């Protein structure tokens, strides 16, 4: 579960390293976001000469959460960190690579491009 002020790692090669959630999209009173939800982030740390800079505001999709997610078959999946992938205006990933595993729930949320870029889908 991601809410406002939550720090996330950026799991793509846009050059950002750490981001902070500043808004959960999808309703004015919406408080929490889960895997596959779109949030607004601000970049807190970035590597030099990258396409995203510190202080930039972007939309992102959540690909990993520390809070477990229950699946239809009764199993739970949990990750070591909270991570997101930066999106462009068309809601497609801005980077060309996705680092680390991503959850299968992204397939249900119609983020097939993120799933295809990921090295491992859990």
Swiss-Prot record:
Stored SMART domains: Ribosomal_L14 (SM01374)
Keywords per UniProt: Ribonucleoprotein, Ribosomal protein, RNA-binding, rRNA-binding
CDD domains: Ribosomal_uL14 (cd00337)
GO cellular component, one term: cytosolic large ribosomal subunit
Disulfide-linked positions: none
Stated name of the protein: Large ribosomal subunit protein uL14
Record GO terms (molecular function): large ribosomal subunit rRNA binding; structural constituent of ribosome
Gene Ontology BP annotations: translation
InterPro entries reported in the protein's UniProt record: Ribosomal_uL14, Ribosomal_uL14_bac-type, Ribosomal_uL14_CS, Ribosomal_uL14_sf
Subunit record text: Part of the 50S ribosomal subunit. Forms a cluster with proteins L3 and L19. In the 70S ribosome, L14 and L19 interact and together make contacts with the 16S rRNA in bridges B5 and B8.
Keyword RNA-binding: yes
Family assignment from sequence similarity: Belongs to the universal ribosomal protein uL14 family.
Role summary: Binds to 23S rRNA. Forms part of two intersubunit bridges in the 70S ribosome.
Pfam families noted in UniProt: Ribosomal_L14
